[in-house]
Amino acid sequence: MICSIGAVSATDLNDNSTVEVTSSVDDSISVDEASIIDVGQNQEVASTSAATWDELKTACQSSGDKVITLTGQSYNANSQIVFGNSATIIGSSDTYITTNNPNLIPFFNSNSNLNITFLNVNFKDSNCKIFIQSAGNNELNNCIFSNITTGAGKTSVVYNTQGLMNLDNCTFTNCHTQYGTITNYGSNVRMNVDNCNFVNNTSSNIGGAICIDSKNTTVANCNFTNNLANLNQGNAIEVRAFGANITG
């Protein structure tokens, strides 16, 4: 089943809820690749490339802001990247990041002054605690997350903590989590989810696709297909904070 969410208030949303259908979508969902990103022309940013996970880790943790182009094919996240600069990571349809460590958070940022961007990055076939957990200002554009399982507790594929996170034109498919594929949690968090697709995702607890635990959340122009929360609390979206905006 496919539904487009439009003009609803803060409450639990299920894939089989009655909602205003604003547009129809095909069974096959494609994401156009973007080729241009504004990384801040008024600041000096070094460009580099990374062919392996270790090279990516070195670039992300070093001083000085970086634009990092992924030039390898498969990146095995066998350790944690703790961001040390405002990094922009640029992938392509030929590259992907994967991991098999249920206790690992491959990408982590607790510095509220950093700006982290993922552009055209594919994350797939993984078992981890959380894939991306970040404070600061975060942009995820044209990224694909597929076949990802997260660990026990309040875990998600993408977890926003004490910062601003914008997700645009991203796709989440066949992900199994505890707390939604995306979670916006905390008193000082803001999240905007626009033009994203959520297909065949499941949660052992709540929020099959998205768990909203902050009123500073906007979900717009997103499509939800066959998502499931085992506790039947928000098969598509679990809203736990009044004031969140969900529009078509």
Which ranges hold each PLM region?
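All-beta strand scaffolds that present successive hydrophobic residues in beta-strands
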Residues: 89-91, 113-120, 138-145, 165-168, ...
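Right-handed parallel beta-helix/beta-spiral solenoid domain characteristic of secreted/periplasmic
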Residues: 86-130, 141-149
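Secretory targeting signatures
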Residues: 1-20
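Serine/threonine-rich, low-complexity intrinsically disordered segments
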Residues: 50, 54, 71, 90, ...
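Acidic Gly/Asp/Thr-rich repetitive segments characteristic of extracellular carbohydrate-active
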Residues: 14-74
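Extracellular beta-strand/beta-solenoid scaffold signature
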Residues: 80, 101-109, 125-135, 149-162, ...
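N-terminal extracellular ligand-recognition/capping segment immediately after the signal peptide
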Residues: 51-54, 65-87, 94-95, 101, ...
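Flexible, charged surface loops at secondary-structure boundaries
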Residues: 59-65, 69, 82-84, 109-112, ...
